[in-house]
Amino acid sequence: MINKLSLLLFSMLRYTLFYRRFSIAVSILFLSCCCTRIYSQQLINSSSSDQVRLETTESKIESILSLMTLKEKVSMCHAQSQFSSPGIPRLGIPELWMSDGPHGIRAEINWSNWDYSGWTNDYITAFPALTCLSATFNPDLSNQYGTSIGEEARYRKKDVLLGPGINIYRTPLNGRNFEYMGEDPYLASIMVVPYIKGVQMNGVAACVKHFALNNQELWRGHINVEVSDRALYEIYLPAFYAAVKQGEAWSIMGSYNQFRGQHCSHHKLLLNKILKTDWSFDGVVISDWGGTHSTKEAALNGLDIEMGSPINNETSPRHAYDANFLGTSFLELVKSGEIDERILNDKVRRILRLIMRTTLDSSRPLGKINNIEHSQVARKVATEAVSYTHLRAHE
């Protein structure tokens, strides 16, 4: 009798435990399905929202483009001052303001010369150079760095930050190696992506430079670089590829040097083929300052905005740049039909897209300047770089 009672109790207990476990399992499965469905729906909604936003932006761009005169379109393709390009006031299109540099926002420069303006409120955080950042081997810290410098650029009302620089070290004698992320294409590729995302979350475009093969400063405006396709794709381009495909950079700066006999700021292979076609880059190509040498090549080979000093200083400051390569001479070539207006329209679409992403984005934050958080990021970068370098030296 006792054995039967014990067996009955044991069976009831086992059934209860099984039932509870079964109930819990069913509940977990149900919740999992619900959560998966909710999460999937969130992803769908997010994707749909992004698609709607994209379609709205592109629709606005086409509407604006249809209202612009030929002269207005061309005016957006060149500078109006040392660090800005014009907008179209009658259509509510603002100017684009740019600034150096990769490790600190440059003090204000005069409108039409390279003298400093003497402002007293343009102080910033001086961050360690990008070589130091790269030496931390810390992508999260790279994102903090980019976010901080993006906040300072935004506070100073800059729309395009002229950086980061990711040219690969080819020679230790390059005077700007300190600005770049090292000699390792893989490391530079890993570190540049979070930097770009940090900058651009502030509604400020990262302008990744110098595209491409700008690996020495001596005679940089004239030197003709010759490298094999293998070296080009395996050493000199991977960091730029990561910047475009993973970092989704909004702008790229062409370099001063030539590559296989053609200047890189209007290079058919680098800009039209590799960057805009193979990599599907939808942003703006900006020349290095004074890096443009031909109206036809600039128009046909992928340059969108020509920057630099005015060729003609005799006219009023606001029209001094009309004499530059993508100014009046470009306008005349389009008017004559020698250059198809569709080529001009593609440039203007890209510029308008950049403006939509930056200065016309009403949701972008106001920015911050020279605060304790930025100083802490700068100090952490310097500390981690020195510590890691010291440890590696004693391995």
Set out the residue ranges of the language-model regions.
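Glycoside hydrolase catalytic-domain context in secreted enzymes
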Residues: 41-392
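Bacterial Sec-dependent N-terminal signal peptides
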Residues: 2-44
